[in-house]
């Protein structure tokens, strides 16, 4: 069993039950899924760029991403409806815990001038969104093979009802929030 999943069952669940006075263990919020999305704007003129982004996301998450397509045509960006412009991966279960563990313990500390992630990135429904400026913070990415530095959005979807519950859950998991 994954280290974080075990920690959730043995330590985090009892701690949250006592803090928020839940009547049942099933009321305890948990991480439902993690969605990693990367936009590849230069895929409009360069189709190789999208292939590279898909390959990098596959290495980072261990799962093949879905290519996202443009919903509308935007003339200013030379974009037609249905053109591939990004990639996203939805992680659940074991892979989700492994990715989250890697993100918190390895990748985030590798960010330059890292002082913690913002406490304000909750959406009011208990979900947390995190922007990463470069894919190089992940250990799977080989620095020499990167053609272009790309960022990504990481959305952590929890079953928490409020932001306070979600913040406490992620703090217990070891998410480094700003002081």
From Swiss-Prot:
Domain of life of the source: Bacteria
Gene Ontology molecular-function annotations: RNA binding; rRNA binding; structural constituent of ribosome; tRNA binding
Gene3D superfamilies reported for this sequence: 3.30.1440.10
InterPro entries in UniProt: Ribosomal_uL5, Ribosomal_uL5_bac-type, Ribosomal_uL5_C, Ribosomal_uL5_CS, Ribosomal_uL5_dom_sf, Ribosomal_uL5_N
Key words, A-Z: Ribonucleoprotein, Ribosomal protein, RNA-binding, rRNA-binding, tRNA-binding
GO annotation, biological process: translation
Matching SUPFAM superfamilies: RL5-like
GO cellular component, one term: cytosolic large ribosomal subunit
A Pfam family of this chain: Ribosomal_L5
Biological role: This is one of the proteins that bind and probably mediate the attachment of the 5S RNA into the large ribosomal subunit, where it forms part of the central protuberance. In the 70S ribosome it contacts protein S13 of the 30S subunit (bridge B1b), connecting the 2 subunits; this bridge is implicated in subunit movement. Contacts the P site tRNA; the 5S rRNA and some of its associated proteins might help stabilize positioning of ribosome-bound tRNAs.
Complexes and interactors: Part of the 50S ribosomal subunit; part of the 5S rRNA/L5/L18/L25 subcomplex. Contacts the 5S rRNA and the P site tRNA. Forms a bridge to the 30S subunit in the 70S ribosome.
Family: Belongs to the universal ribosomal protein uL5 family.
PANTHER family the UniProt entry points to: 60S RIBOSOMAL PROTEIN L11-RELATED (PTHR11994)
NCBIfam families, sorted: PRK00010.1 (NF000585)
Protein name: Large ribosomal subunit protein uL5
Organism (species): Bacillus cereus (strain ATCC 14579 / DSM 31 / CCUG 7414 / JCM 2152 / NBRC 15305 / NCIMB 9373 / NCTC 2599 / NRRL B-3711)
Gene: rplE
């Amino acid at each position: 069993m994954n280290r974080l999943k075990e920690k959730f069952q043995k330590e985090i669940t009892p701690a949250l039950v006592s803090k928020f006075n839940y009547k049942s263990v099933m009321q305890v919020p948990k991480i439902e899924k993690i969605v990693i999305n990367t936009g590849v704007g230069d895929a409009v003129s360069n189709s190789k760029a999208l292939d590279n982004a898909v390959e990098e996301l596959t290495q980072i998450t261990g799962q093949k991403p879905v290519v996202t397509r443009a919903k509308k045509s935007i003339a200013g960006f030379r974009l037609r409806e249905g053109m591939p412009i990004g990639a996203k991966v939805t992680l659940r279960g074991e892979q989700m815990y492994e990715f989250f563990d890697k993100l918190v313990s390895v990748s985030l500390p590798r960010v330059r001038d890292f002082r913690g992630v913002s406490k304000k990135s909750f959406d009011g429904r208990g979900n947390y969104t995190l922007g990463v400026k470069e894919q190089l913070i992940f250990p799977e990415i080989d620095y020499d093979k990167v053609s272009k530095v790309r960022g990504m959005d990481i959305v952590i979807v929890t079953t928490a009802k409020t932001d306070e519950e979600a913040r406490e859950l992620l703090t217990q998991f070891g998410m480094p929030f700003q002081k």
